[in-house]
A protein has these predicted regions:
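C-terminal transmembrane helix-loop-helix hairpin of multi-pass membrane proteins
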Residues: 7, 148-230
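Small-residue-rich segments of transmembrane alpha-helices in multi-pass membrane proteins
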Residues: 33-42, 78-88, 217-230
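Helix-loop-helix junctions within the multi-pass membrane cores of secondary transporters/permeases
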Residues: 96-179
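Hydrophobic transmembrane alpha-helices
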Residues: 1-75
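Alpha-helical membrane segments and immediately flanking helix-loop junctions
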Residues: 11-14, 51-58, 67-83, 87, ...
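Hydrophobic alpha-helical transmembrane segments
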Residues: 16-18, 39-41, 61, 88-89, ...
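Short helix-perturbing small/polar motifs within transmembrane alpha-helices
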Residues: 9-17, 60-63, 75-122
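Helix-coil boundary and interhelical linker segments in multi-pass alpha-helical membrane proteins
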Residues: 1-7, 38-49, 85-105, 230
Length: 230
């Protein structure tokens, strides 16, 4: 990867981060979209899609609505994709083992997204007071600047989260990849299925109990029918 690739990834980080909370909200911030979008910009959309699919289930029931500030799933997807696309050939990994290792490293680093998101909201609280005072004083231009600065604070929070994930994740990959390569390659398929099952459990946990039971029974019967028809 060259500097232009990292610049593109940074732009996608800011764009998807703004879509997550502050601007438009057309769902490009979802891992299932942010991952492939980052991968496409870096020339490897398949890696981004694999990362996005694994992360989407895990975070589908945790949205940044109201006062809720979950770990930043958007930047986890962006950061993990950058890690997988940019460091694989250096550590001697590719394919699903590299994807799994990148995801496992990026997920805990997503907690930094909560910290930066809280800081951005605190800054925006002060900007809201300044904007209100400016409006009451008749300074509409200053009020508009305060409004736009609120977008900047969220954008910088997203970029900072992605930077932490990429920088710390790269250090962890280069340091521990030689030790973890064997274990990841050996447990690759079972680990992949484990993440999918955990994601499915998280998703079912957010649904209505009666509806969840109905969905489970329908899926179970459908699977039996498919096996019987084969």
């Amino acid at each position: 990867m060259v500097a232009v690739d990292y610049l593109l990834a940074g732009m996608i980080s800011v764009l998807t981060g703004l879509d997550r909370v502050a601007l438009v909200q057309i769902m490009i911030s979802r891992p299932l979209v942010a991952g492939p979008l980052t991968g496409w910009a870096l020339g490897n959309p398949l890696v981004g899609l694999e990362i996005g699919m694994l992360l989407e289930l895990l975070w589908l029931g945790r949205l940044p609505v109201g006062a809720a500030i979950p770990p930043d799933d958007t930047q986890v997807a962006v950061g993990a994709t950058v890690l997988a696309a940019g460091t694989g050939h250096f550590v001697g990994l590719d394919g699903m083992p590299l994807v799994l290792l990148s995801v496992l490293i990026a997920i805990p680093l997503g907690k930094f997204g909560q910290v930066f998101d809280k800081l951005a909201r605190q800054v925006n609280d002060r900007l809201a007071v300044s904007g209100y005072n400016a409006l009451m004083s008749g300074h509409t231009a200053k009020m508009e600047r305060c409004h736009l600065l609120g977008l900047v604070s969220f954008g910088l929070a997203s970029l900072a989260t992605a930077l932490v994930i990429v920088l710390v994740g790269t250090f962890v990959l280069f340091t521990f990849a030689p030790v973890l390569i064997g274990a990841i390659q050996e447990a690759g398929l079972s680990l992949q299925y484990s993440l999918i099952l955990v994601g499915a459990a998280v998703l079912l946990g957010t649904t209505n109990v009666n509806r969840g039971i109905s969905l489970f029974c329908t899926a179970f019967i459908g699977t039996l029918l498919v096996l019987w028809l084969r």
